[in-house]
Every structure is written in structure tokens, then in C-alpha cells.
From Swiss-Prot:
Keywords noted in UniProt: Cytoplasm, Cytoplasmic vesicle, Phosphoprotein, Protein transport, Repeat, Transport
Region (Disordered): 1-49, 371-454, 494-561, 599-636
Subunit composition and interactions: Self-associates. Interacts with GGA1 (via GAE domain). Interacts with GGA3 (via GAE domain), AP1G1 (via GAE domain) and AP1G2 (via GAE domain). Component of the aftiphilin/p200/gamma-synergin complex, at least composed of AFTPH/aftiphilin, HEATR5B/p200a and SYNRG/gamma-synergin, which plays a role in the AP1G1/AP-1-mediated protein trafficking from early to recycling endosomes. Within the complex interacts with HEATR5B/p200a and SYNRG/gamma-synergin; the interactions are direct.
Modified residue annotations for Phosphoserine: 151, 395
Gene Ontology terms describing biological process: intracellular transport; protein transport
Function as written in the Swiss-Prot or TrEMBL entry: Component of clathrin-coated vesicles. Component of the aftiphilin/p200/gamma-synergin complex, which plays roles in AP1G1/AP-1-mediated protein trafficking including the trafficking of transferrin from early to recycling endosomes, and the membrane trafficking of furin and the lysosomal enzyme cathepsin D between the trans-Golgi network (TGN) and endosomes.
Protein name per the record: Aftiphilin
Species for this entry: Mus musculus
Record field: compositional bias (Acidic residues): 19-29
Gene: Aftph
Biased amino acid composition, Polar residues: 371-381, 439-454
Sequence motif: WXXF motif 3, positions: 476-479
Organism ancestry: Eukaryota, Metazoa, Chordata, Craniata, Vertebrata
Length: 931
């Protein structure tokens, strides 16, 4: 939906079927400007000069979602504004009073239990002395192109009339598309379709007033092209009291019937149209606004079908009869009614009491909110008189349901069935996109806290500035500017146009201008955050509402109060300051204060009137609480937070007084300084005298640090020497390797060896057996052995001499304790007597013979076997389990037996250690050994 797509052209309706011959009727029919359902006029674009020659298709842009359909030739679809004639028919007056206020005040679509302020468009023509003046205005409309009687300050806060300063609707019949009110996403058809056709007849007045066909154009709710089912069914939001759509037949006023309304003919109030001089309803005047006293407001379901024009379809209900009203004001009021949408299930919850002061006044030339706040005693009195007459319904209403619509509405108003312009619509699927009707400059703020109890609110008089509590869903179809706070007129006007209209208004109706000047400001406050309907792409921000534009954001999360408006400004060409799609800035404090002041003034200035009194200002406690809560919630979060922080700061300061602690510079002395106090001067000692504990601690730490264990070196210590001496290790044979921190003690001979290996001779390597054979010889040798020993090869071997110095070892015999060294022989000690010089002491002859026998190349295996047999025989002798005492020992037999029973460990005396092998000698070798 482009903002500049929709251009509104003259919407002059075709001549009425039932009254086409009357020129005055046509003039009233063209009087779309005053009958505009949404004086809040959505300024989609700068309106072109009215052109009656253009076809109807020009009214709708190519991409506009509203259906295009031909003008309906049905008389009921057109508002027939008959010439005003003097008459005394009070019945007609009663009938007329019903649509005046009730239709405008009631917004029948409310889904989430949120109140939508009645959008009564009160086209009060203050500058007119009579309806003839109104005729003049209509006549001059085509040439004027702009209503002079509209003051820039005029606007409606309670959905009555949006500021009329901007060109709401030229007298030429040019109509701006009415804004669409969404109910929780449902596009409720207000009344004005983008094609300039207004269907007020199909809009049932929540107060029981008959549906109004505000403009003389065809009553086709094109704005509601989309069915209510397009959006999710928000019927769940319906309040406890469900409103059923019922057909309410209204009395038909025959042509020529005169409607006499007594009261101030010059009442400056827009809302309180106190005096309507004798008006003749030439067309059929049907009242469909029969309100049920039990909060069951029955409104016929209006289905605007583009293809079939206006089809008033009613689910299980009779079709509403369309009304023809003399007043554009009635039209504008009707537009504030429920957003009729296709397939809307239950449109209205309650019908507000029709306020009699909303009747079309002969002076009603200004569709502004100036009259909203005017609660003058004179006007109140006149409105009361009008109410008394209006509450006396003597209209020729054949339908019993439509009888005393005013009385029913008044009773409902008195009973609190209908709130101040608030009608909660339950299960209303009126959220068709097409509801551009009554695009009130003030979209009702979104109410959250008072949703459940809104039904208790009696709607205040239209003259009263009441915050518009409307559901966010209704705002979807209502293309109003969120930021047009004080300027509820959404029509695009240049500053010159505003000034011109204001001048004209001041000239024609100074009273209205005065009231507008007085009330426009608070209205702007009320408007703030309320005009953020989905549309009004071209609305120009008014200077008055600039201060409160920030609060008209899409979702002002700073204060989610009941008065918070759901602002859809994403599609506006000229987004006001802070009126962006998601401008979540805080509400200005001034706005909240103004809102609260307006509430106070509204609720205190206008007191509860009698049943006949046009003003029913009694608001239920829930509504008042909601209003106050909304005012408080409007306060910016930052200001409230700041105030709370300041209070908390004062409380903490009182509870915890701050104690001034002087900064003391303390010089920290080093540990060394503390420990060396004994060497410091006396003054230092005195200064540290009080620090005895600290000094004691450091002293203990110093003792640990200077412990002897940390200074002890194991190597070379006395204990180390004692240990080595006890182990019989010569310290000279110990080599200390590695670094100083981790010395490694290794034997001296293994210092340069990775592995202990036998020493090799430089000439010829000799095996261990050869070395043993060279040094060992047996005393008793067989000839073979002797021959072997005399072998030249054996003789060629040099004598084995162990070089102690080169090996790095110390000769144990040379050592001091050499005498104590053990004589380790493998097989036992060798008798010195049996040993000879030819043998090496410490080596057994059998072993020697065995080793040398292998060296003999000429010997046979027999000789080797014999040698081994000898060795084994020797082993048997020496390895006996009994110990043989030495010869020199003189022991008794008992001792000898005990010693013999002990294991023989004499092999440990052998100097050469060999692992014993268990060999069983052969019999031959055993025999030879025995021989």
C-alpha cells in the first residue's frame, strides 16, 4: 500500500431515486465534506480539485485492495439530505437524536476487551444560523474545494470528529478515504471507503441510533473489501457480554415530516449539537439503532462486497434498513460506529447511550473537537432539553424492536451498558482492510489494564475529552497518522490552507474557534499515541501535536498503559518526529501530565446528568482506574526511574551516613629492615617496639630460611664417609660425575664404560677360557694334560698380569683392609699343601683341566668327557650338604654333627664366581675318575 496511491476525487452520488427531483436533496447528498465519516480525513495525498466527470474507478488506485463497484441505485444506499424545513414533529426529533450521538460515539468493534472510543463525527456547523446556511455551504462547496468553517484547531479526541482544519472533504463531494480501524489485526470498516462512498446506513449505532448514511454517495463499504476472516478470528477477545448482530427496524420518517429540535440554534459545540431547527426528512428515515438494555448491542452485520455493491448480509438476522439523514454530522457520527467488515460475526458488545446533545445543530458547520471539551452550562441545559424531547420517541416506528431507540440507548447509557464512546465488540471479524471509515485523528489508545472492566464504563458526552480506549486491531484499517496528536484531521493541507480554514472558521463560528482553541491542546494530548492507525500515509503533522508525536509510535513500550495506542505508521510518507514504525522512545512527561489533566477535567467538569441529560459522564471505577493508570503509564520510564533512584539515594544516605576516613600514608619497611632492628638506631627500635609480633614472625621465617639442612652437602660429609666405610667401599674407587647440583656416584672403573666388558689384548684377543688356562694348572696332571700344557701355543701366551692402575681399580691386597677381604673361590678353598707352583691359587684343578681340555685341538671327545667327569666328581665332593670341619679344628662329635648338618657355603670363598651347572657325568668318566 503505497502512501501516494490513493487519490480521492469528487464522490458526488448519483441522484437519489426517491428524491432526485429535489435540488436541495442533491445538495445535501453532495455535502460529503460535513458528512464525511472520518473528519480525521486520511490525507493519502494532496486532494485534487473535485471532478465530477471522472468515473468512479478513478477513486480507487490500481493496487488498492478495495473492490471497485458501481454506484448502487438503491435509494437506501444513498444519504438523502432533505431540505431543512420548520416542523414540530417531536417524534422525528427523537428519531434523529438517536443517530446523532449514538452512532458517532460507538465504536462497536473491540476484540481484545479493549475500549474503542466512539468516533462520533459531529459536524456541528457553528457558523450557520440555520440549515439554510448549511445549504449555502453545500452550494459553495464545489467552488470552494475547502470548508471555510473548519478551524485548524478543531479536532476530536473522542473519535467524534478529527480536526477539520485540513480539507476533510471539499464541498464538491470530494472525500478522503476514511481511515481503517483494526481490531486485533481485523480491519474494521469504519464507513468511508477509498472510493469516496460512505456507508453509514450499514453501520449500526452502538447506542441504538439508526445507521447513518453520512454522505450522499453510495453506501458501499468498499473499504471493507477484504473479509473479516482474512485476519485471525479474535473472537476470543470478546468480553463476557457478547454483542449479537440483530436487525433493528427503525421508524421511517416520511418525507415532509418535520423534526423539531429545541435548544440553542447557535450552540458553538460541535459534539453537543444542541439545537437543530425544524428539519424535514424527505427520504425514508429508518432507525436501526435499537440498543439492548442488557449490554447486548445487536448490530446488523454489514458485508461490503465490491462486486455486488453494498450487500447488507446478516447472519440469521434481517438486513438493516438504510437511513437517510439530513445531517452530515449524523454521517460523521455514524462513521464512528463499529468498523463494519465483511463476514463480521459479532460486531458490537454494547451500544452507548445516544447523547442527545450530539443532534445535528443548525449551527454545526465545524467538524472539530473544539466542542468536545465545551461543557458549558448553557449547552448542557440545551442538550438536556433536547434529550428530554428526544427520549420521548414518538416516531412512526412500526418495528417494536426499533421503538424508543433513544430511550433504550439512554437507559443503556444510564445503566452503564455503554461506555463513553466505548463499545467493546466481541467476536467481531470486522477487521477487513477496507474499513477506512472514521479515520479519527485520535486512534483510541490501546487499553490493557482495563480490558475486563471496560463494559462498566458509561460513555462520556462527546463534548468531553475522554481518552480513546480502542483496540489495536481496529487501528489497522484506520490509516491515520499516529503523530497527528493535536491535529486529528488527517487531510493533507498546506499551511496556507490551514490558516485559511482557521480564518474562515474564526469568521463563521468564533465560539467554535474559541472552544477549539481551548480544547485543541488537551485533545492533542489525548490524540497522542492514538492516531497511529495503519494508514494516513499523507497526513501532515500539526504544530500542536508535534510535542506529543513521540508517543504515537508503533509500540511505545516505555509505558504499556491502557491509553497506549497501537501505532502503525510504517506506511506514512511523512512520518512525524518520533512517529517511525518502531520508535520506542519514552513518552514525554508533559504528555502524561496533559493526559491526566484532561482526564481530571473531563471527569470533574462534566457531572452525571439525569437520564434525559445528554451527558452521561459517569464512568465506572474500572474505566476511571484505567484512565488514571493510562495517564501514569504514559509517564516516561526514564523520569519515573530517575525519581525512584533519587529517593533511594536519599534513603540510603539517611540509613548509612558516610563517615569521612582520612587517608593515612603508612610506610612499609622491608623484611631486612625489620630483622636488623638490633643494628638500627634507638629511634628506629622505639618506632618498631610496637611491632614486636611482626618482628617475631619475620625472625621465625629467617630461622627457617637459614636452616642448616639447606646448607648441608651430603657428598664428602662425615655421615657419608661413615656409610661408605661400613659398606667396605673405598672412597678412592668412587667417581663423582654429573653436575654439582646432582652428582652421580659411580665406580671408578666404570666411569668411561657404557658396559662392563673384558679387557682385550692388543696382540690377539683371548677368550676368558684361555686366560684361565694360562694362569691355572693342576698339580696332578695326566700325560695328556702335561702335553697340553707344554704345547707351544700355550707357552706362547704371555703371563697374565693385571694392571691395577690402568683399570682404575685399587688392589684390595694393598688396601688397608685387604686382610679382611673374603677369599671367594667358586668350588671352595684349595689346600695349600696340594697346590703347586704350576697352578694358580684359587682355581680348582678340575675346572682348569676342563677349560684347558677344550683348547687342545688333538684331543678327542673322550678326553673332554674325562675332564668333565673329574670336574663333576670334584663337585660331588665339594658340594656335599655336610660341612667338613677343617683339620685344625678340634670339635666334639656333637659339634661336628651340627656343623655337618649345615649347608656348605665354602664356595663363597672362591675367587672366581661361576654359576654352577647340573651335569651328570657319564659312567665311563665316573669309572675313570674312580680309577
Amino acid at each position: 500500500m503505497e502512501p501516494d496511491i490513493i487519490r480521492m476525487y469528487s464522490s458526488s452520488p448519483p441522484p437519489l431515486d426517491n428524491g432526485a427531483e429535489d435540488d436541495e436533496e442533491d445538495e445535501f447528498g453532495e455535502f460529503g465534506g460535513f458528512s464525511e465519516v472520518s473528519p480525521s480525513g486520511v490525507g493519502f495525498v494532496d486532494f485534487d480539485t473535485p471532478d465530477y466527470t471522472r468515473p468512479k474507478e478513478d477513486f480507487v488506485p490500481s493496487n488498492h485492495f478495495m473492490p471497485i463497484h458501481e454506484y448502487s441505485e438503491d435509494v437506501d444506499s444513498l444519504t438523502s439530505f432533505k431540505s431543512v424545513q420548520n416542523g414540530n414533529d417531536k417524534d422525528i426529533t427523537a428519531e434523529l437524536s438517536t443517530p446523532v450521538k449514538s452512532q458517532s460515539d460507538v465504536v462497536l468493534s473491540t476484540t481484545s476487551k479493549e475500549m474503542i472510543p466512539s468516533k462520533t463525527l459531529d459536524p456541528s456547523i457553528d457558523g450557520m444560523e440555520s440549515l439554510e446556511d448549511l445549504d449555502k455551504v453545500v452550494v459553495q462547496g464545489p467552488s470552494t474545494g475547502q470548508l471555510r468553517s473548519f478551524s485548524p484547531g478543531d479536532f476530536r479526541t473522542d473519535k467524534n470528529i478529527v480536526h477539520q482544519t485540513k480539507q476533510l472533504e471539499s464541498c464538491n463531494g470530494e472525500k478522503p478515504p476514511c481511515l481503517e480501524i483494526l481490531t486485533n489485526g481485523f480491519a474494521g470498516l469504519e464507513t468511508v471507503n477509498p472510493q469516496g462512498t460512505d456507508d453509514l446506513d450499514n453501520v449500526a449505532d452502538s447506542k441504538g441510533s439508526k445507521p447513518l448514511n453520512t454522505c450522499g454517495t453510495e453506501c458501499i463499504l468498499e473499504s471493507a473489501a477484504s473479509h473479516a476472516t482474512e485476519f485471525a478470528d479474535f473472537s476470543t477477545f470478546s468480553q463476557t457480554e457478547r454483542t449479537q448482530l440483530e436487525e433493528i427496524e427503525c421508524p421511517v420518517l416520511n418525507d415532509g415530516d418535520t423534526l423539531t429540535i429545541q435548544g440553542n440554534s447557535k450552540g458553538p459545540r460541535v459534539k453537543e449539537l444542541n439545537c437543530v431547527k425544524e428539519v424535514t426528512l424527505d427520504g425514508s428515515f429508518e432507525d436501526t439503532g435499537n440498543t439492548e438494555r442488557e449490554h447486548q448491542v445487536c448490530v446488523s452485520e454489514i458485508h461490503a462486497v465490491a462486486d455486488r455493491g453494498l450487500s447488507v448480509e446478516k447472519q440469521d438476522l434481517q438486513t438493516l434498513q438504510q437511513d437517510e439523514f439530513l445531517n452530515s454530522r449524523i454521517q460523521s457520527e455514524a462513521w464512528s460506529l463499529v468498523d463494519s467488515s465483511e463476514n463480521s460475526e459479532a460486531i458490537t458488545k454494547e451500544r452507548c447511550k445516544m447523547e442527545k446533545n450530539d443532534l445535528f445543530a443548525s449551527k454545526c458547520a465545524d467538524l472539530s473537537m473544539d466542542s468536545v471539551k465545551t461543557s458549558d452550562v448553557n449547552e448542557i441545559g440545551s442538550s438536556k432539553e433536547e434529550n428530554r424531547k428526544l427520549t420521548n420517541p414518538k416516531s412512526p416506528d412500526p418495528d417494536p424492536t426499533g421503538q424508543n431507540a433513544l430511550d433504550d440507548s439512554a437507559a443503556s447509557m444510564k445503566n452503564g451498558d455503554s461506555g463513553n464512546g466505548f463499545v467493546t465488540c466481541h467476536d467481531t471479524n470486522e477487521d477487513d482492510f477496507g474499513d477506512f471509515g472514521t479515520a479519527n485523528g485520535t486512534t483510541p489508545p490501546f487499553v490493557t489494564s482495563t480490558q475486563d472492566s471496560m463494559s462498566d464504563v458509561t460513555f462520556e458526552d462527546s463534548s468531553e475529552h475522554f481518552l480513546h480506549l480502542s483496540e489495536p486491531g481496529d487501528d489497522f484499517g484506520e490509516f491515520e497518522d499516529t503523530n497527528a496528536v493535536s491535529c486529528q484531521e488527517e487531510m493533507r493541507f498546506t499551511e496556507s490552507d490551514l490558516r485559511q480554514t482557521s480564518d474562515g472558521l474564526s469568521e463563521e463560528c468564533p465560539l467554535a474557534g474559541e472552544s477549539g482553541g481551548k480544547d485543541s491542546k488537551p485533545d492533542s494530548k489525548l490524540k497522542n499515541g492514538q492516531d497511529s492507525e495503519f494508514g494516513d500515509f499523507d497526513s501532515v503533522p500539526n504544530t500542536q501535536g508535534s510535542a506529543f508525536q513521540d508517543s504515537d509510535d508503533f509500540a511505545d513500550f516505555s509505558s504499556a498503559g491502557p491509553s497506549q495506542a497501537v501505532d502503525w505508521n510504517a506506511f506514512e510518507d511523512e512520518q512525524k518526529d518520533g512517529c517511525s514504525w518502531a520508535a520506542f522512545g519514552d513518552q514525554q512527561e508533559t504528555e502524561s501530565h496533559h493526559l491526566k489533566e484532561v482526564w481530571q477535567s473531563q471527569r470533574t467538569d462534566e457531572t452525571m446528568g439525569t437520564l434525559g441529560t445528554p451527558k452521561m459522564h459517569s464512568v465506572s471505577s474500572a474505566a476511571s482506574k484505567g484512565a488514571v493508570a493510562s495517564g501514569h503509564l504514559q509517564e516516561p520510564g526514564t523520569s519515573v526511574q530517575t525519581a525512584l533512584l533519587n529517593r533511594l539515594e536519599r534513603i540510603f544516605e539517611a540509613c548509612f551516613p558516610s563517615v569521612f576516613v582520612p587517608d593515612v600514608e603508612e610506610e612499609v619497611s622491608s623484611l631486612k629492615h625489620l630483622l636488623e632492628t638490633h643494628s638500627s638506631p634507638a629511634k628506629t627500635r622505639e618506632a618498631l617496639a610496637d611491632r614486636g609480633e611482626l618482628r617475631g614472625v619475620w625472625t621465625e621465617l629467617q630461622d627457617i630460611h637459614d636452616a642448616h639442612g639447606l646448607r648441608y652437602q651430603w657428598g664428602g660429609s662425615h655421615s657419608n664417609k661413615k656409610l661408605l666405610c661400613s659398606l667396605g667401599i673405598d672412597t678412592r674407587n668412587i667417581l663423582f660425575t654429573g653436575n654439582k647440583k646432582q652428582p652421580v656416584i659411580v665406580p671408578m672403573y666404570a666411569a668411561g664404560l657404557g658396559m662392563l666388558e673384558p679387557t682385550k689384548e692388543p696382540l690377539k684377543p683371548l677368550s676368558a677360557a684361555e686366560k684361565i688356562a694360562s694362569i691355572g694348572q693342576t698339580t696332578v696332571m695326566t700325560p695328556e694334560i702335561n702335553t697340553c700344557t707344554s704345547d707351544p701355543f700355550q707357552e706362547s701366551l704371555p703371563p697374565v698380569q693385571f694392571d691395577w692402575s690402568s683399570s682404575g681399580l685399587t688392589n684390595p691386597l694393598d688396601a688397608s683392609g685387604g686382610s679382611t677381604l673374603l677369599n671367594l673361590d667358586f668350588f671352595g678353598p684349595v689346600d695349600d699343601s696340594s697346590s703347586s707352583s704350576s697352578t694358580i691359587p684359587g682355581v680348582d684343578p678340575e675346572l682348569y683341566e676342563l677349560t684347558t681340555a677344550k683348547l687342545e685341538t688333538s684331543t678327542s671327545s673322550l678326553r673332554v668327557t674325562d675332564a668333565f667327569a673329574k670336574l663333576m666328581s670334584t663337585v660331588e665332593k665339594t658340594s656335599t650338604s655336610t660341612r667338613k670341619p677343617k683339620r685344625e679344628e678340634h670339635l666334639s662329635e656333637e659339634a661336628m654333627k651340627v656343623i655337618a648338618s649345615l649347608p656348605d657355603l665354602t664356595f663363597m670363598h672362591a675367587k672366581v664366581l661361576m654359576f654352577p651347572a647340573t651335569l651328570t657325568p657319564s659312567m665311563s668318566s665316573q669309572e675313570q675318575a674312580d680309577a
